Amino acid sequence: MTAAATSISSIEGFGLELRPWDAELVRQMAAWGERGFPFHAFDMGHLRDPAQAEAALLVAQQKSPHHHYVACEDGRAVGRVSVNLQDLSGLYIWAVHVPPEHAGRGVCRRMLAALMSHLEAALPAAPEFILSSNTFAEPAHRAYRALGFEVVETRWHFDKEIAERLWKVGPVQREPIGRHIRFHSGRWQVRTYVFKRRRGTPMDAVAARPR
């Protein structure tokens, strides 16, 4: 696997270190537990394949407006997040993921708090923070709201990963997210929230601190 250097610097804060991807972190993420449907698109099991792991690392280390981080706690990978610094809508945060074995300790909130605090200081003229999330991801929404995000739009969206799996699962598996999906114009769609956080919006310090 390549050991190519990346120009992205680490970020420290809220008990975490957000580090750029490297071969060791890819190995750790490959060993994470998986959530499965309907959150399967975030699972990292594909990194167990050496070819896919190498390809993913190459993408993550490319010089790009997209910066990819792995949140580490005492050297252990506990979450991941990416940000597009040149999206027309704002500083677009995406690929927010905490594996099940690290849930319940505020990793998501702390990871985003560290990232946004750093970007606000490093890019004083940068626009607002934006992220989108499928409406069934309610635990994530609690974290986003605690950090000052507000829903500014609700839309129906074609999510390729969700749509492909919906063709394969039965009514029983679809039922828990039934009110969040629809079959429209010949394909499956999922309802999505667009969240926005204005620069300087207070973050819930209790929600973001290490536990």
Residue ranges and their predicted role:
Residues M1-G13, K196-P202:
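Acyl-donor-binding surface of acyltransferase catalytic domains
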Residues P20-V26, A30-A95, P99-E101, L112-A113, ...:
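Acetyl-CoA-dependent GNAT
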Residues P99-E101, R105, T135-F136:
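Active-site acidic-Proline motif in GNAT/NAT acetyltransferases
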Residues R109:
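Residues forming the Rossmann-fold NAD(P)(H) cofactor-binding site
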Residues F129-H141, H157-E164:
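Conserved beta-strand-loop-alpha-helix junction that forms the acyl-donor binding cleft
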Residues Y144, F149:
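Conserved active-site tyrosine of GNAT-family acetyltransferases
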Residues V151-E153:
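A secondary-structure capping/hinge motif
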Residues A163-V194, D204:
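A C-terminal cap/extension of S-adenosyl-L-methionine-dependent methyltransferases
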